[in-house]
Amino acid sequence: MSEPTGNAAMAAAAAPAPSPGPAAAPAGTIYDLGYKRYTGARQATSTRWKVIARNQFASAWKTWWRYKVALGFAGIVTAVAGGVMFLLQDRVVNGVVVPGNIAAVLSDQALPMSITWYTRAAFLLSITLVSSVIARDMQSGAFTFYFARSVRPRDYVLGKLIGMFAVTSTVMLAGPLALALARLALSESLDQLVATLPILPKALAIGVLSTLAFAAVPLGFSAIIANPRHAMALWAVYYLVVGGMAYLLARLMKNGFGAVDITMAIEGLTYDVLDIVQLRGRSKRIETPLAVTSLLVHAAAGVSIIAYRVRRAHLAGIGGAS
């Protein structure tokens, strides 16, 4: 075999050496892509409760049997009571079918008589949704998610309360207000409108107190037990059994002990504020101060239980905010 010529040897020497292939990265290599500070919009710490409240309402709206059934029930009550008001203002009914003075009385009583049905819709909502909210968070470990993001206990409590208040208000507050506005709209004269105008703030006050009770008390029961079913059962026992016992004792003893029953307190407040003689109903008439005190005490007890349980969970090491 002949040796390469001089020119061939020089060309081979001048040729670039082949570049080595890319080295295989060792297993477990971490690629440092650099750190870039977040430059987007930031929310103040004091507004974090709003996020929780909005999430509560949005989550409730997505459910059918937990929220929308109770909402539909309240809508039916509003439609029926409003229809009765409208029919009693009709000239054929008013004065022909029903005497004029009786028609006016029945029209005024449509709102207070519907309160009992609104409380049933609110109880349905509380038993299917409100009474298990915090229990579900405790059972699923959602507290870790909340407090790991520096959500303060008071933000959690405030967000849950306002969220459930907003949900319950669509059942217990919107209906009475709609009926009060309907009663004003059906006034036959300006004098009658002015005379009926106080029904609006009265309906607002009744609705706010009732909504507060049906939001805070079931939510308090949901904070007692970490099992949603047990929390719902505990709230149902208190509302039905304890409330029923208070009703029976009030009838036997002829006193205001029936205000322990939330529904009875709301009914007594409604009849007293709207100055309607209670011809039939749960028991002896409950005066406004006693009814308001009962509803506020119930709400305060519910909020206290929620605050205690959430603060205790926070201090147990679940989160790190203060």
Ranges and model annotations:
Residues 2-22, 87-92, 96-109, 229-322:
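Terminal transmembrane helical anchor/hairpin motif
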Residues 45-47, 54-73:
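Membrane-interface helix starts
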Residues 21-43, 306:
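Short, contiguous pre-domain boundary segments
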Residues 105-119, 158-159, 163-219, 223, ...:
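Secretory targeting signals
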Residues 65-90, 121-124, 235-243:
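Hydrophobic alpha-helical transmembrane segments of multi-pass membrane transport/permease proteins
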Residues 133-166:
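Helix-loop-helix units of permease transmembrane domains in multi-pass membrane transporters
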Residues 110-136:
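Long, hydrophobic alpha-helical segments
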Residues 126-130, 174, 178, 216-217, ...:
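Hydrophobic/aromatic residues in alpha-helical transmembrane segments
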